[in-house]
Amino acid sequence: MKEGIHPDYREVLFIDVSNDFKFVTRSTIQTRETAEFEGKTYPLAKIEVSSESHPFYTGQQKIMDTAGRVEKFRNKFGSRATGKVAAK
């Protein structure tokens, strides 16, 4: 393998922002932030969904609205978004 052409493969702290679940794994992701976890400082990567919050793994259906998308949709379309097909 050539020297200097491969990304740095290192331990990275991932934080699921929907439920504050943290885990460390190895990755080549480039981050600017760092965080301390279990007494050690790691590069920090924030993620919206992990195995701790995804409905497939948790067995629970829940709305994960991190950016106000549901409210924005309801404000834009209101009662028109009832799912009923309009008669022609």
Swiss-Prot record:
Q: Which PROSITE patterns match?
A: RIBOSOMAL_L31
What keywords would UniProt list here? Ribonucleoprotein, Ribosomal protein
The keyword Ligase appears for this protein? no
Q: Name one GO molecular function term.
A: structural constituent of ribosome
- Keyword Methyltransferase attributed: no
Query: What is any one of the record's Gene Ontology cellular component terms?
Result: ribonucleoprotein complex
> Tell me, which GO biological process terms does this entry list?
translation
The family annotation for this protein states: Belongs to the bacterial ribosomal protein bL31 family. Type B subfamily.
Record NCBIfam families: L31 (TIGR00105), PRK01678.1 (NF002462)
Q: What is this protein called?
A: Large ribosomal subunit protein bL31B
Q: What organism is the protein native to?
A: Paraburkholderia xenovorans (strain LB400)
What gene codes for this chain?
A: rpmE2
